[in-house]
Amino acid sequence: MTSAESARRHPRTGPPGPHWTPATVRPVSEPSRHGPRYGTVDTDYALRMAATPPEEDGPVWMVNLMKYREIADYGDDGESTISGRDADDLYAPFEVLADIGAEVVFFGDVEAQLLGDSPTWDRIGVVKYPTRRSFVEMNSRPDFQKKHVHKDAGMQETIVIGCLPVDLPVFETQNWAEVPHPPTDDDGPITVVHVLRFSGDSTADMDAYSLVAGEVAIPHGVRIHGWFAAEGTIIGDGRTWDQVRFNAFPSRAAFHAVATDPYRLAAQADHREPALADTYAMIVAPGLDALATSL
């Protein structure tokens, strides 16, 4: 990734926000007056989303980290015998998303969590909304709220990060049929998702690491499907984040070869670890990956 220094935290587009007054904001669908059970709404970010004129609004990518209940909990509405994952499948508001011009651009189950102790995430999803206003308005629609009952029942915990694309490093894309560990029926493509919070102004260290990681990973077929700057966390556990990165590998064997490379490991110790205050890293089996074409 020979121009990693261009991949800063700065987004490519302008500031967020629909032309709403703060008094009209309803940042996240509320199953009750106490708000959703699976996380805490960041009202400051919601207000920022609501404070910018329409001409300064634009697309936002909402990155969802999902942890399910073992058994869905519908509260007073009745005893449940389905899993939290199944309840989330019932939620899936595809019709609502299509109606407002939003689309799911990434979706997959977490196979392994490499970094970050708790929670252990189950799924990752990304929805691209045409504007921040469309995201806010969606949450007050009756048809969305009806479906949201299933999300509240199935979700134990979630983090939803509003993101904008950053400029990507430029490098030659390898033909996956010609790399040392090509995809096979038994070992197909994976996406490694990194959720990053930097330690102070430490992008220089992260850039230095990315240069080395790129030198190692490019011959093994890595493809950057999207790097994003976090503009806010609309719902979560109170932590803030700086970036989310989606790197695709042709196979698990290819990722393993990169992860265990001594040159990359030395750069990780010298640069990546000092650069980060908090992180998750997950191997995801993508069921849908249209991130690159959504940028």
Where do the PLM segments sit?
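Short S/T/G/P-rich N-terminal loop/turn motif that feeds into the first structured element of a domain
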Residues: 2-123, 130-137, 154-266, 274-295
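Short, surface-exposed basic-aromatic patches at helix termini and helix-loop junctions that form
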Residues: 140, 150-153
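Short, amphipathic alpha-helical segments
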Residues: 129, 138-145
